[in-house]
């Protein structure tokens, strides 16, 4: 089974250059460990939310909103696509992710298409 780990971070917990550097290093090491044991199937960090766009269409009218988006304290920082036998195993893998300490990690099963 495949799962997406949606990595969020609280900007207040990675506010300094030193905190950000440490976070990037720790997440990189975590990713390498998943790659090494064959668990990691894909993933990537994302550009900052300040560069994001959100599109909403209501009643045929499209609006494009510029980030950051005030309704959320945590921001999505990246994702991993992993292989695991079941949701419990995926949660155990996600629990080791450093983002759980300075944000959160959401685990979602991928729905096979086709």
Label the model's feature ranges.
Residues 1-114:
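Conserved, structured core segments of small domains
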């Amino acid at each position: 089974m495949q799962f997406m780990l949606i990595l969020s971070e609280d900007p207040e917990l990675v506010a300094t250059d030193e905190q950000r550097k440490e976070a990037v290093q720790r997440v990189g090491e975590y990713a390498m460990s998943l790659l090494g044991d064959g668990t990691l199937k894909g993933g990537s960090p994302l550009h900052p939310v300040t560069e994001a766009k959100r599109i909403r269409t209501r009643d045929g009218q499209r609006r494009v909103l510029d980030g950051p988006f005030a309704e959320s304290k945590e921001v999505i920082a990246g994702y991993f696509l992993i292989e695991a036998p079941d949701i419990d195993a995926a949660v155990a893998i996600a629990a080791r992710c450093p983002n759980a300490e300075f944000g959160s990690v959401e685990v979602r099963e991928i729905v096979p298409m086709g």
